[in-house]
């Protein structure tokens, strides 16, 4: 089972919709781009972003923590766009969370397109799609389709074995990568040892 994941879906939806206006959306995009560069250990690119402010912290020891800190900032800003209270990021015209809606509509359309090509969609959530027996053709199709809407798909995992319990809980055995042969559980049902 191939697990394709959209990198920073909601932030990229906010960027594509220019939700903060041109100037502030560009600044928001700089933070998102810096996080992605750090996550992929591209310290040279990250060092050029945000006027070099992150350069002193760009090393193997601090990379994961820095990427996580930027993720918190990004998600906080995104969350404030649809908060019920007044704040500088909230637009009162955004009554139905346009950022989340854009992503949800995209994933619905993607599911329909993948199924129309004859593939099974085992699981689809906010920013990921899982396809059993995925071929290179369908993976390339999904990546290209995502690019057309401003989304970048990455391979989150390839599972040798996969058990979907419900819409939010699954257990899988990694097929390859640094965790090859290991099992993972998503959802508290299988993570509590008693």
Located regions from the model:
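Conserved acidic
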Residues: 1-194
């Amino acid at each position: 089972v191939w697990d394709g994941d959209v990198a920073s879906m909601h932030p990229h939806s906010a960027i594509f919709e220019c939700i903060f206006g041109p100037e502030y959306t560009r600044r928001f995009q700089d933070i998102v781009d810096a996080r992605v560069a750090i996550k992929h250990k591209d310290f040279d690119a990250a060092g050029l972003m945000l006027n070099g402010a992150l350069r002193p912290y760009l090393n193997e020891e601090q990379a994961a923590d820095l990427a996580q800190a930027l993720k918190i900032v990004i998600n906080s800003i995104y969350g404030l766009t649809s908060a019920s209270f007044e704040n500088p990021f909230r637009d009162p015209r955004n009554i139905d969370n346009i950022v989340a809606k854009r992503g949800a509509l995209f994933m619905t359309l993607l599911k329909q397109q993948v199924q129309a090509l004859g593939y099974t969609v085992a699981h689809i959530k906010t920013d990921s799609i899982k396809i059993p027996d995925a071929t290179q053709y369908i993976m390339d199709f999904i990546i290209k389709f995502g690019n057309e809407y401003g989304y970048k798909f990455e391979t989150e995992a390839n599972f040798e074995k996969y058990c979907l319990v419900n819409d939010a809980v699954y257990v899988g055995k990694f097929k390859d990568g640094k965790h090859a042969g290991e099992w993972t559980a998503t959802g508290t049902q299988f993570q509590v040892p008693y």
